[in-house]
Amino acid sequence: ISCEGPQGPQGFDGFDGADGADGADGVNILGKVIDIQGTFTLDNDYSIFYEFPQTIEVFETDVVLVYMLWDVTEDSNGESVDIWRLMPQTRILDQGLLQYNYDYTFFDVSIFLESDFDLSTLQPGDTDDQVFRIAILPAESTTGKLDTSNINSVMSHLGITEDEVQKVTLQ
């Protein structure tokens, strides 16, 4: 017996089955922006150390960028506008070259000074109450074009407003 002949009509769809169990919640991949303020001294070896609190989860694949508050200016309405620069940043001083630099792990950020002269000769304006903005970009969010030199572009990309930036003063 052989099955030959024209193909028959398409059958009807079956009944929908019962919904399966819900899957586990996924990880909420969110970026974070933190401002830290600290002072470089001989006692802290001219470095500022910030350990991420347990409320901030940073993965090894995430990107951590640090910006330095370089200056403050005014807009046409007389409102203050912060000028941020992506680190590292180098200043040319009478004593020589001074570089503000950083490194990070998924546990912490270390911001430090490097120079070709004795750092104890620095003026307080170069060391005291310096403000840095740390931006944590999840690896999943860094695909495509993003101007990381512009903190406003980074914050917009992460969906973070100025009011949502956590402020931390280090001792």
Residue ranges of predicted features:
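Collagen/collagen-like triple-helix recognition
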Residues: 2-32
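Extracellular or exported targeting regions of proteins
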Residues: 30-131, 135-171
